[in-house]
Amino acid sequence: MTLLPQILLVTGAVAWGLGWLPLHHFASVGLVGMPLVLLVYGLLSLFAIPVLWFERRAWMPQRNGLLAIAVCGGGATAALVTALAIGEVVRVMLLFYLAPVWGVLGGWLLLGERLTPLRIGALLLAMLGIALTLNISSALTHPLSGSDWLALAAGLGFSLNNLATRAADQVPLASKTLAPFLGSALIAVVLCPVLGE
């Protein structure tokens, strides 16, 4: 029996859990928001573009699905990276992890999936959990911060990305995986001058 799956799972969880550390380091030296997204995902796009070009014949019939993956996944990544760099990490991650709520609702509204009593119960428990964790009574008297809104947008974008990924079933896995990198870089290219960064 091989331990490779367990090692990969633990390694991925550790990398995901500690991914905010370099973001805070970059923020401490003044590289934050869309310029950071442009730098990181611009570099990753250098690897993504050749793969996307090589697989273009396979994804061309579902190019709109791949575009949705790039926009939704790229937007989610850009929003999450910025929120983690400027906000409270725990709060940002809690708001981001409402993504399954948006995913269930999106599956119901966009893909016609059934909302079973079990799913409705899970949605209600998730909303109650976030309300208790974030102290909803104070949230009603204090508006959400910019990083809070970015975290919510990231969760919503991630859910829409997952729905688009499921719908674009003929797009090769490598293209589905790499398109959000290019999407993040392009979103940052547009938003850097708009935001004056």
Q: Where does each model-flagged region fall?
A:
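Membrane-interface interhelical linkers
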Residues: M1-V14, S28, L43-A68, L115-I120, ...
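Specific transmembrane alpha-helical segments of multi-pass solute transporters/efflux pumps
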Residues: L18, E55-R91, L132
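Membrane-interface helix termini and inter-helical loops of multi-pass transporters
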Residues: W20-G33, A85-E88, L134-G146, C192-E197
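Alpha-helical transmembrane segments of compact multi-pass small-molecule transporters, enriched
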Residues: L43, F47, L95-L109, G183-I187
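C-terminal transmembrane-helix exit sites in multi-pass transporters
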Residues: L52-E55, T82, A99-G121
